[in-house]
């Protein structure tokens, strides 16, 4: 009995699909947002799958600012993590869900679905966050270009003024990334059924 012919194209597609599946994870892990305010406060956000870490420090000699830094960090962490943690999980989980769901339908849908979902998520996430959060010359893009002083941060006003992050960007990304990925994924999963009809 002759050995079964190896389908190298199928193997190559599976490999490409697996790589594409993890593309958002790799890209997000390499993303860091650095912002500096006019008061000399450095804000840094490190993005990783299922996790958002932030750091804040000051290069000013202002004693008041130095004393208030722990409180500034507290509110900065709240503003960033509360807005982004759920969003990060969505973008990490969607490709995996599509991948697993496709396995039970069609092997080609696995590869194509994972690849497109992965590339879509990674592209939208990186472009919008990198361009959006670094678009302000004053370094205040995190707060929509609005002036935010240490006192504003301390009193939690940053949660109100950070509309650029909490509303615009998140809305655009969740809207575009979520629906586009789901539509493509569902179409790919449904394709084998439509093809057989």
From Swiss-Prot:
Q: What's in the keyword line of the UniProt record?
A: Cell membrane, Membrane, Transmembrane, Transmembrane helix
Q: Name one GO cellular component term.
A: plasma membrane
Q: Where in the cell is it found?
A: Cell membrane
What kind of membrane protein is this, topologically?
Multi-pass membrane protein
The keyword Transmembrane helix appears for this protein = yes
Which parts of the chain span the membrane according to its record?
11-31, 85-105, 109-129, 174-194
Protein name, please?
Uncharacterized protein MJ0979
Native source species: Methanocaldococcus jannaschii (strain ATCC 43067 / DSM 2661 / JAL-1 / JCM 10045 / NBRC 100440) (Methanococcus jannaschii)
């Amino acid at each position: 009995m002759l050995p079964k012919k190896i389908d190298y194209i199928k193997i190559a597609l599976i490999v490409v699909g697996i790589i594409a599946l993890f593309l958002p994870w790799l890209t997000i892990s390499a993303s860091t947002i650095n912002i500096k305010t006019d008061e000399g406060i450095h804000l840094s956000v490190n993005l990783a799958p299922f996790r958002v870490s932030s750091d804040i420090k000051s290069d000013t000699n202002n004693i008041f600012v130095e004393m208030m830094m722990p409180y500034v960090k507290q509110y900065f962490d709240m503003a960033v993590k509360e807005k982004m943690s759920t969003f990060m999980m969505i973008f990490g989980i969607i490709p995996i869900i599509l991948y697993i769901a496709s396995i039970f339908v069609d092997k080609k849908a696995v590869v194509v679905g994972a690849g497109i979902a992965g590339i879509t998520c990674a592209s939208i996430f990186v472009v919008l966050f990198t361009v959006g959060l670094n678009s302000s010359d004053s370094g205040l893009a995190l707060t929509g270009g609005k002036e935010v002083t240490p006192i504003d941060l301390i009193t939690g006003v940053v949660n109100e003024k950070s509309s650029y992050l909490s509303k615009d960007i998140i809305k655009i990304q969740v809207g575009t990334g979520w629906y586009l990925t789901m539509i493509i994924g569902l179409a790919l999963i449904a394709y084998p059924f439509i093809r057989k009809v």
